Amino acid sequence: VSVDCSEYPKPGCTMEYRPVCGSDNITYGNKCNFCNAVVKSNGTLTLSHFGKC
């Protein structure tokens, strides 16, 4: 399972709720929020699965 975060970081994310679970066991509201966190983590954060943790 993976997400393409090559277009990130983005300055703002929509409020669309399509949760993804990160390897840090945090539920991110959508791909944009998750990808911004991936960039901030220098790539150490990965996708655990789609849906809530």
UniProtKB/Swiss-Prot annotation:
InterPro entries: Bifunctional_prot_inhibitor, Kazal_dom, Kazal_dom_sf, Prot_inh_Kazal-m. GO terms for molecular function: serine-type endopeptidase inhibitor activity. Residues 3-53 form the Kazal-like domain. The keyword Glycoprotein applies. The record marks 15-16 as: Reactive bond 3. It comes from the Eukaryota. It holds the Pfam family Kazal_1. Avian ovomucoid consists of three homologous, tandem Kazal family inhibitory domains. This is Ovomucoid. It comes from Peliperdix coqui (Coqui francolin).
